[in-house]
């Protein structure tokens, strides 16, 4: 009789635990998705973390972290990953149990082969009952994205043209005077304009004196990108422009040339929602500078660009390049070179380099003719 009573108590306890664990399996459980770096190179692993934490006072005998990936995300390993039956994606799923206050961190590596912006789906946290028969899930809040910048453009003609442009930029450093930096004073000559006389120094000295300007101490440039995908079925010209722009900026970084970057492109919906009204409908740009952080901003802009322009090429060049600044200019564009030169019009002696996708076509034709 006592054995029967004990068995009944055991069954009642199991049923009670089963009911409690079914209802409260996700109580005090938090899940979060983390991306090690949202800027990832094409073809390189992008590591993401699925973290589950038990902040409650009770053990959690069964927990799982689940993330669905679209077909653009290519897993680097098949561990804990199953392919959808439709073939349109993959599902990452990790299972564990947690003590009170314990946290589990699961990581997986993905690859993205094409330039662009990719949004990760929200992570799901799954809790199970005491007997492992019933599961309930919860979708965690949060927004995560991966930005893939374009690959560099491997064109010998591009490297040759950039080499000539950078050489001319270095020469101009010692040709043009900087109207801001004063190197000293010298006697006034008949060829100097009256406005250049330094009256304060003239009173102290032995006659009229004028300021002696220093030469430009830092080479500067402006990089403008106008890539218009007029034919949606053939985005290759715009993609090539983005690749050439990356190569241009990398060469400027190597030569420690301070540059300002602007891309005439519509950007993703995240930026559209973050900015009110029509203010978002303008090109993104970086301030004058160079260095790792500056270059990283350039790569992110190139990765986010959609290939759809906001301004006409002429208006874009007019608003983002000012000849009076006497800054060298590089324009990467799908427009004809003649139209760009007519829109930019730098002052005499200021270098202007126009790069178009036709360079690649000419290179391919030259290679075929040589073969």
Regions found by a protein language model. Give the residues of each.
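Exposed, interaction-prone extracellular/peripheral surfaces
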Residues: 159, 187-371
